[in-house]
Amino acid sequence: METEAAVTATVTAATMGIGTRKRDLKPYKGIRMRKWGKWVAEIREPNKRSRIWLGSYATPEAAARAYDTAVFYLRGPSARLNFPELLAGLTVSNGGGRGGDLSAAYIRRKAAEVGAQVDALGATVVVNTGGENRGDYEKIENCRKSGNGSLERVDLNKLPDPENSDGDDDECVKRR
């Protein structure tokens, strides 16, 4: 009778998700999610108690790629990575590995570059269902219509031109 109760308690705990919460919130090594939804990455320096802050990112993949870059620079090709296939071509001579001259600031800068690239790629996703339906759409973010009806990228670092501002540039959708 006690075994049945233990089995029932184990099954109930497993179906309720008790004990699996931490694994669900951290899909990759070296990252965590803030209360407000941003993903952050950090790594401990070898043989020290201090941590290297790698940045805050919109997606867990970007934070994980930043962590992978940092761990590769710190520990070399033998490091356990979240995405080992993406760093397979790099060697110690290409910049990664146990170089004694690598400062925390250098590692932070390199990791932030990679994370920012992944975030930027995720922000400009092009959806193309491409098919026989007449309702196929292609959505492009950060764009505006040019004079000939085509779409062109907008430089988000520049102030908007008051002459071309008509209020319709919130979202560009081009019918295919």
From Swiss-Prot:
<feature type="compositionally biased region" description="Acidic residues">
    <location>
        <begin position="163"/>
        <end position="176"/>
    </location>
</feature>
<keyword id="KW-0539">Nucleus</keyword>
<dbReference type="Pfam" id="PF00847">
    <property type="entry name" value="AP2"/>
</dbReference>
<keyword id="KW-0010">Activator</keyword>
<dbReference type="InterPro" id="IPR001471">
    <property type="entry name" value="AP2/ERF_dom"/>
</dbReference>
<dbReference type="GO" id="GO:0003700">
    <property type="term" value="F:DNA-binding transcription factor activity"/>
</dbReference>
<dbReference type="GO" id="GO:0009873">
    <property type="term" value="P:ethylene-activated signaling pathway"/>
</dbReference>
<protein>
    <recommendedName>
        <fullName>Ethylene-responsive transcription factor ERF008</fullName>
    </recommendedName>
</protein>
<keyword id="KW-0936">Ethylene signaling pathway</keyword>
<comment type="function">
    <text>Probably acts as a transcriptional activator. Binds to the GCC-box pathogenesis-related promoter element. May be involved in the regulation of gene expression by stress factors and by components of stress signal transduction pathways.</text>
</comment>
<dbReference type="InterPro" id="IPR036955">
    <property type="entry name" value="AP2/ERF_dom_sf"/>
</dbReference>
<dbReference type="InterPro" id="IPR016177">
    <property type="entry name" value="DNA-bd_dom_sf"/>
</dbReference>
<dbReference type="GO" id="GO:0000976">
    <property type="term" value="F:transcription cis-regulatory region binding"/>
</dbReference>
<keyword id="KW-0238">DNA-binding</keyword>
<feature type="compositionally biased region" description="Basic and acidic residues">
    <location>
        <begin position="152"/>
        <end position="161"/>
    </location>
</feature>
<feature type="region of interest" description="Disordered">
    <location>
        <begin position="138"/>
        <end position="176"/>
    </location>
</feature>
<keyword id="KW-0805">Transcription regulation</keyword>
<comment type="similarity">
    <text>Belongs to the AP2/ERF transcription factor family. ERF subfamily.</text>
</comment>
<feature type="DNA-binding region" description="AP2/ERF">
    <location>
        <begin position="27"/>
        <end position="84"/>
    </location>
</feature>
<dbReference type="GO" id="GO:0005634">
    <property type="term" value="C:nucleus"/>
</dbReference>
<keyword id="KW-0804">Transcription</keyword>
